[in-house]
From Swiss-Prot:
Belongs to the 2-oxoacid dehydrogenase family. The gene is EMB3003. Residues 39-114 form the Lipoyl-binding domain. Residues 1-31 form a transit peptide. Keywords: Acyltransferase, Chloroplast, Lipoyl, Plastid, Transferase, Transit peptide. GO terms for cellular component: chloroplast; chloroplast envelope; chloroplast stroma; cytosolic ribosome; nucleus; pyruvate dehydrogenase complex. Residues 136-148 have a biased composition (Low complexity). GO terms for molecular function: dihydrolipoyllysine-residue acetyltransferase activity; protein domain specific binding. The modification N6-lipoyllysine is found at residue 80. It comes from Arabidopsis thaliana (Mouse-ear cress). This is Dihydrolipoyllysine-residue acetyltransferase component 5 of pyruvate dehydrogenase complex, chloroplastic. It holds the Pfam family 2-oxoacid_dh. InterPro entries: 2-oxoA_DH_lipoyl-BS (IPR003016), 2-oxoacid_DH_actylTfrase (IPR001078), Biotin_lipoyl (IPR000089), CAT-like_dom_sf (IPR023213), E2/Pdx1 (IPR045257), E3-bd_dom_sf (IPR036625), PSBD (IPR004167), Single_hybrid_motif (IPR011053). GO terms for biological process: pyruvate decarboxylation to acetyl-CoA.
Length: 465
C-alpha cells in the first residue's frame, strides 16, 4: 500500500541545499540557507517500525511536474521492501534534493513541493543557492517520527545534517513479466502505460528485479525504448565482482546486520529431531497438481503443532515477561536479490492447505519484487528456514529478535533404518533443528513440540482439512 505524505503546517522549517561530493560514499557538508515562500518539504517516510533511513529507488515524477493529491511521486527502498510514496497535496515538484540511489534518514527532506507554478523557480534557486549542482543532495538532521511534508516559511536557518551518498550498483535486469507471471510495475507506470498505450509485457524495467518505472514507459513511448532496454541488459548481464573492493551494505543488508547483532543478546539453545517423510512425500505428490507447495505443508504442520504447544509460539521482548501470542503466524525465510526476508503466513493453523499455498505463492512473488507490506513480513511468531532444496541435511538458524523460536529444516533423504521386526529397511528422513529463547522455552517444551510435529508429518491426514 502506498504511503501518503502528510503535511502539518509549521511556522518555519529548515531547508538543506544541494552539496557536491567528489567521492562516492563520503558524507557531504551541511549548509545553511533561508527559505521564503509557500513551499513544502517532502520528507523521507518511515515505511516500517525498524526503518531508520531509506534509499531513493526512482523518482516517478520529474522536477517541474504537476502533482495531484494521492499521486505517486517517488519509490523508496526501506529495510525490507520498495514502496510508492504519494503526495497528500496538489502542487508542483519544484526541486529534487536526494537523487536516485541517494540515502536519507527517516524524516529528512528529499524534495520540495511548490503550491503554484510561479514558486518553482524560487524553490529551485533557494535549493541550489548554497552550493554547486552536485550529484547528491543532503537531507537535514533530527528526523521526526513520521513521514510528512511541511510548509516552508520565512527566515529560519538550520544546518542540514550529512548523509552518506552511495553509488548505485549495477544489478542484473530482469524482464518484468516472465513465463506468464504478473507484470511488476509501479502504479504510476501502469497508469502511464495505459494512457500512452504502451504494452508492458516483455518490457525490461530499470527498477529493482526488473520493476518497470515511469521512465521505462516514457522511453518506449518516445521510440527506441525497447532497444535501449535491451542494450542495458547486454551491459549488465555479465556478472562480475571486483575483488578487494569495499561494498557498503544495502538498506536491507543493514537491517539484517542490526537484527543479527541484536539476537546475540538472547540466550538460546538448540534441539534436533529426525522425522520420517514418506507419508508427507506421498501426500505432496498426490495434491501437488492442485497448487499445493511443500513449504505450505511444512508451515501447516508446524502451525498445528504450535497450537498444541503455545509456549513455543510465545515471545519475550523486555526480559521481564513473555507473551502467549494470540495468533500463529509462521514466517518463512526467503532469499531474495541483495538480502533475506521472511514473508508471514498468518493464522496458518486455521487456513486450509490450498488457500495457504496460494497465499504463499503470492507472498513470494511480492517478496522478490520487493513489494511486501510491513504486516506481511514483521508479524511472524515462529520462523521456518528451509535449505533442503540445496541438499543441506542439517544446519542451525539464528533466532530473529522478538520471536521465541526458529526451526531449520534440512533435506529429506533416503536412510537405512531398523524396522519394528528387526529387519533393515529404507525410509526418507529429514533433520530439523530448533533454536529457542531459553528465557521462555525450555528443553522439555521443544522436545514435546518436536514429538507432536513428527507425529503430524508422519501421519499427515490433518493437513488437508
Amino acid at each position: 500500500m502506498s504511503r501518503l505524505l502528510q503535511t502539518p503546517f509549521l511556522p518555519s522549517v529548515s531547508l538543506p541545499t544541494k552539496t557536491r561530493s567528489s567521492v562516492t560514499g563520503f558524507r557531504v557538508k551541511p549548509r545553511i540557507i533561508p527559505i521564503q515562500a509557500k513551499i513544502r518539504e517532502i520528507f523521507m517516510p518511515a515505511l516500517s517500525s525498524t526503518m531508520t533511513e531509506g534509499k531513493i529507488v526512482s523518482w516517478v515524477k520529474s522536477e517541474g511536474d504537476k502533482l495531484n493529491k494521492g499521486e505517486s511521486v517517488v519509490v523508496v527502498e526501506s529495510d525490507k521492501a520498495d514502496m510508492d510514496v504519494e503526495t497528500f497535496y496538489d502542487g508542483y515538484l519544484a526541486a529534487i534534493m536526494v537523487e536516485e540511489g541517494g540515502v536519507a534518514p527517516v524524516g529528512s527532506a528529499i524534495a520540495l513541493l511548490a503550491e503554484t507554478e510561479d514558486e518553482i523557480a524560487d524553490a529551485k534557486a533557494k535549493a541550489s543557492g548554497g552550493g554547486g549542482g552536485g550529484d547528491s543532495k543532503a537531507p537535514p538532521a533530527s528526523p521526526p517520527t513520521a513521514a510528512v511534508e511541511a510548509p516552508v516559511s520565512v527566515e529560519k536557518k538550520v544546518a542540514a545534517a550529512p548523509v552518506s551518498i552511495k553509488a548505485v550498483a549495477a544489478s542484473a535486469v530482469h524482464p518484468a513479466s516472465e513465463g506468464g507471471k504478473r507484470i511488476v510495475a509501479s502504479p504510476y507506470a501502469k497508469k502511464l502505460a495505459k494512457e500512452l498505450k504502451v504494452e508492458l509485457a516483455g518490457l525490461v524495467g530499470s527498477g529493482p528485479m526488473g520493476r518497470i518505472v515511469a521512465k521505462d514507459v516514457e522511453a518506449v513511448a518516445a521510440g527506441g525504448g525497447v532497444q535501449a532496454a535491451v542494450a542495458v541488459k547486454e551491459v549488465v548481464a555479465a556478472p562480475g565482482v571486483e575483488l578487494g573492493s569495499v561494498v557498503p551494505f544495502t538498506t536491507m543488508q543493514g537491517a539484517v546486520s542490526r537484527n543479527m547483532v541484536e539476537s546475540l543478546g538472547v540466550p538460546t539453545f538448540r534441539v534436533g529431531y529426525t522425522i520420517s517423510t514418506d507419508a508427507l512425500d506421498a501426500l505432496y505428490k498426490k495434491i501437488k497438481s492442485k497448487g499445493v507447495t511443500m513449504t505450505a505443508l511444512l508451515a501447516k504442520a508446524t502451525a498445528l503443532a504450535l497450537a498444541k504447544h503455545p509456549v513455543v509460539n510465545s515471545s519475550c521482548r523486555d526480559g521481564n515477561s513473555f507473551v502467549y501470542n494470540s495468533s500463529i503466524n509462521v514466517a518463512v525465510a526467503v532469499a531474495i536479490d541483495g538480502g533475506l526476508i521472511t514473508p508471514v503466513l498468518q493464522n496458518a493453523d486455521k487456513v486450509d492447505i490450498y488457500s495457504l499455498s496460494r497465499k504463499w505463492k503470492e507472498l513470494v512473488d511480492k517478496a522478490r519484487a520487493k513489494q511486501l507490506q510491513p504486516q506481511e513480513y514483521n508479524t511472524g511468531t515462529f520462523t521456518l528456514s528451509n535449505l533442503g532444496m540445496f541438499g543441506v541435511d542439517r544446519f542451525d538458524a539464528i533466532l530473529p529478535p522478538g520471536t521465541g523460536a526458529i526451526m531449520a529444516v534440512g533435506a529429506s533423504q533416503p536412510s537405512v533404518v531398523a524396522t519394528k521386526d528387526g529387519r533393515i529397511g529404507m525410509k526418507n528422513q529429514m533433520q530439523v533443528n530448533v533454536t529457542a529463547d531459553h528465557r521462555v522455552i525450555y528443553g522439555a517444551d521443544l522436545a514435546q513440540f518436536l514429538q507432536t510435529l513428527a507425529s503430524i508429518i508422519e501421519d499427515p491426514k490433518d493437513l488437508t482439512f
